[in-house]
Structures are given as C-alpha cells and as structure tokens.
Amino acid sequence: MNRAELKLEAKNQLRHNWGWAISIGFVMTLFVGFFFARPVVNGSLKTVNSVNDVMGTGSIDSLFKPAFWAGQFGPDTGLTIIGNFFMLSMVVTFLHFARGERLSFFKGIFSAFTDGRFVPEFLNYLCGYIFQFLWSLLLVIPGLIKSYSYAMTPYIVNDLVESGQEVHATTAITASRQLMNGHKWELFVLNLSFIGWYLLSVLTLGIGYIWLVPYEQTTKANFYRRLAGDRYLKK
C-alpha cells in the first residue's frame, strides 16, 4: 500500500474541510488530554511508590501478589476508559469523513457513545486491551505486534454496527487480526512517517497538533478503507 498516496488523498479530502476537521479534532484532543492527564500522573506515582516499597522491604515476591497489582487500579481507571472512548470517537468520525460524510460537531465528538456503538466498542476495546497486556507480559515486542494486529478493531466495529450485524466481545478483534495479516509492517511504517509532524508539533508548543490530528486520522481511515473496502458493511 502506497503511503504517499494515502497522505495525498487525505490532504485532498481536507483541503476544503479544514475548519470542520480542526475544530472537531481540537475539541476531542482536549477531552482526551483532560481524561488522561490525571490517571497518567497518578498511575505513574502510584507505581513508583509501590515499587519503592517493594525494594525497601527487599521482598521481590510482593510484585507477584494480586494486592500489589490491584493497587495500581482505582477511580482513575474510569477516566482512562472515557478518554479512550473519545479517541474511538475520533476514529469513527474521521472514518465517516474519509467516506465523504461530515458528522455534525456534537455527533462527531460523541460518535463512539451513540448509534449502538458503545457496548460493542467497549467490549472489543476491553478484550483487546487484556489480550495485548497478556502478550506484553512475554516481551515488549509481542505486545507491540498485537497492538498492530488489533489496530483496525474500532473501524470494523463501526462498519459491523452500521450494517446491522451482531458484534460480540471479540468479533472485531478477530476480524482485525485477520485483516492485518501481512499488513502490520505497512501500518507501522505509516505511523513512523508522521514522526516529523510530531516533532514539529512539539517544537511549536502543541500548535502543530491542530493540523496533525485531522491529517493523521484521515490518513489512517483511508488505510482502513483501502484494506477492508466494504467487506464489513455487507451482511
């Protein structure tokens, strides 16, 4: 798959739609940042403190006790889940946009929560997270590979729901794994091609993200469209 063509297609689609794309992408990014900020900071501090306690006692066995890992989760977990759903809304909204449909501002922001998507998106997201975590216990690389295997899950859930098909907890995960067979490297390289844009965004104190988010999301939606076509839109 030619990534230059995917990016060019995204630029052409955004040419007369930057106002809509920037506004909806900016607001969703704010929501994601808001819901992720506290859990990330608190979670990091909690983990560091827990590990310090373990090292202080000299008992590494504590790392393998359920109580240790249970302590890493709390109220912030709910905020993380909500933040992830706004990320899923971003995926759904720009998939519709890549297909020529501009969702209204509010419908776009909450697209993962509406039209019957919430439960299947949540179940497949949760199962995908668990599977990826279990693979990561082996080594970092297997977990990374699985993250690319499951990368098309939210797109597939959207299409299955829109076509009226029944979506179980692992339906889209399995479909994504099959769809990405032989294409994980292509998506990895596509992601790498945005590194320059991310560096520029950091150097501009985040201003560059205003353009990067719609550009990247539209490009990835086109990647999915090229890969899946209307396969999951058919009953």
Language-model region placement:
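Hydrophobic alpha-helical membrane segments
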Residues: M1-K235
